[in-house]
């Protein structure tokens, strides 16, 4: 992620905390999937933490038919809803990789929920946002601000915890 975007925090500090090497991908590589995939393979990248739009661009343009970055063991994505069709393409090309859906609204630094993907989804299915990370809390509230607890009832997602920006209240 660009350094002026909060998601870069996750990219930078996760590599420092785990002792992994952070590979910076030149922005222009994302417009040419073969060049991007060659780069991932050459650098032996093991973890992708990308926006959904970057993953879907590669799969929709059939980049994975050109070359599969087989060193990738984990794919985490956020920023928008992942289309099940595009996720299945990645899952089929990287069957041993773990896939994780991440969610976090603007007022959260990075993400507040995660959902490990353990199966393939049909096009008509929505991939769940998952459960709250430790130190965070996520609830659904109705139009009156009351917590929604019944399955299938719509509401607004509200979050609280250590990643919430100052001045934002649940």
In which residue ranges do the predicted regions lie?
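Conserved AMP-binding/adenylation subdomain of ANL enzymes
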Residues: 2, 6-46, 119
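SF2 helicase/translocase ATPase core recognition
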Residues: 9-11, 103-110
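Residue-level signal for inorganic ion chemistry
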Residues: 15, 19, 48, 75, ...
